[in-house]
């Protein structure tokens, strides 16, 4: 799953944004599950990056609603 920059997120349609957000949330659950199962994550900073990207996406969604 790609980590998106804010300009890439703003250029997405609302439907595309929803779809990518769902994919990232599933990936975050999978990564957290792997850590809780006792395994070391392949990329330790991945969870943090996923969380930040989700926050960026939700921010853009909220900006669109408020307009």
UniProtKB/Swiss-Prot annotation:
Highest taxon listed in the record's lineage: Archaea
Keyword Nucleus in record: no
GO cellular component: cytosolic large ribosomal subunit
GO biological process annotation, one example: translation
A single GO molecular function term of this UniProt record: structural constituent of ribosome
Keywords of this entry: Ribonucleoprotein, Ribosomal protein
UniProt family annotation: Belongs to the universal ribosomal protein uL29 family.
Protein name (Swiss-Prot/TrEMBL): Large ribosomal subunit protein uL29
Species per Swiss-Prot/TrEMBL record: Methanothrix thermoacetophila (strain DSM 6194 / JCM 14653 / NBRC 101360 / PT) (Methanosaeta thermophila)
């Amino acid at each position: 799953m790609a980590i998106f920059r804010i300009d890439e997120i703003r250029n997405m349609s609302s439907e595309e944004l929803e779809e990518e957000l769902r994919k990232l949330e599933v990936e975050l659950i999978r990564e957290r599950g792997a850590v809780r199962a006792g395994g070391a994550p392949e990329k330790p900073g991945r969870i943090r990056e996923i969380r930040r990207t989700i926050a960026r996406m939700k921010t853009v969604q909220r900006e669109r609603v408020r307009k």
